């Protein structure tokens, strides 16, 4: 439970739009618990402001990735869950990115440079605003850390990331599909 890196997150309170991008190498299949990848924490909630994790899926090299977000902006308060299965992703270095564009209300997920899911959050969702920060967690869930970064303790069904993570990037804008593909092609 203490296998994580914690960073102060006060610089991302009002991201508005964002892109989270990283390379990951996790042995497949993912079993034994949901593996935390990244969290922008919320110290007063079970789930963070933004969470990305691998869900259990006993299907060889297919990744089951979930993205949770909660927006605290004026008219756009709301929790959102997005999930995607990406074939031929595990047991090798693979690239993942999620973008959110506040102007269009669109969230887009990418696997290995290709758009794999686009979700309309709606323009009422608006610019992203996060609250009650307790840092950024890399390689685990916010509630699995010691000390915990949430209002809750560890859960048996949740695990630290079993694998390697590289080139984690946070942008304060939604990168275009071409820019995401460039990150993948240039191994950034």
Locations of regions flagged by a protein language model:
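Short hydrophobic/aromatic patches on beta-strands that form ligand-binding or substrate-lining surfaces
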Residues: 20-26, 38, 96, 138, ...
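Glycan-recognition/cleft segments
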Residues: 35-71, 125-128
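Short, aromatic/His-centered strand-loop micro-motif at the edge of beta-sheets
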Residues: 68-95
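Flexible glycan-contacting loops in extracellular carbohydrate-active proteins
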Residues: 120-163
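Extended recognition patches within non-cytosolic domains
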Residues: 164-188
